[in-house]
Curated annotation (Swiss-Prot):
Lineage of the species this protein comes from: Bacteria, Pseudomonadati, Pseudomonadota, Gammaproteobacteria, Alteromonadales
Gene Ontology CC entries for this record: cytosol
CDD domains recorded: YajQ_like
Gene3D superfamilies, per the entry: 3.30.70.860, YajQ-like, domain 2
Protein name: Nucleotide-binding protein PSHAa2277
Organism per entry: Pseudoalteromonas translucida (strain TAC 125)
Length: 160
């Protein structure tokens, strides 16, 4: 019986390359000359650091443009609150990895509401979709792509 898995993963190599490109642009930008500003990638968190709120927002815009150029979806970024420490302003940007229970339930509901003849089951941080025909599975993929759930999804482990 054909099946595939719906997952939500961020390629860390691409994220690292996007951060490196953003730092390279940061060095050449005129509005950041003489400013203590940086973008760092630690595990699954990108740390933006600057001297003012507006500069942190600009840093995020630079990062978002570089991430989209690398072929990653900007909706995989999770903005957190701006915090201050001394003269610096920080903002952490989380990378969404895996599918949370609530999001998995929304995916299963969207597939069931579409009346496609497939079964969707939540398995940890992924959703397994099985069906009798490959066409049904491709239709289920279209349903998930068209449902605006605020997170990018990849389809892996396609078995016939």
């Amino acid at each position: 019986m054909p099946s595939f898995d719906i997952v939500s993963e961020v390629e860390m190599n691409e994220a690292k390359n996007a951060v490196d490109n953003a730092n390279r642009e940061l060095e050449t930008r005129f509005d950041f000359r003489g400013v203590d500003a940086s973008i760092e990638l630690n595990d699954k968190v990108i740390k933006l650091k600057a001297e003012a709120d507006s500069q942190v927002i600009q840093l995020f815009d630079i990062l978002a443009s570089k991430i989209s150029k690398r072929g990653m979806d900007v909706s995989s970024l999770e903005l957190q609150d701006i915090s201050r420490a001394g003269k610096n302003v920080f903002r952490n940007v989380g990378l969404k990895q895996g599918i949370e229970k609530e999001m998995a339930k929304k995916i299963v509901k969207a597939i069931k509401d579409s009346k496609v003849k497939v079964q969707a089951a939540i398995q940890g941080e992924e959703v397994r979709v099985t069906g009798k025909k490959r066409d049904d599975l491709q239709e289920a993929m279209q349903v998930v792509r068209s449902a605006d759930l605020g997170q990018p999804f990849q389809f892996k482990n396609f078995r016939d």
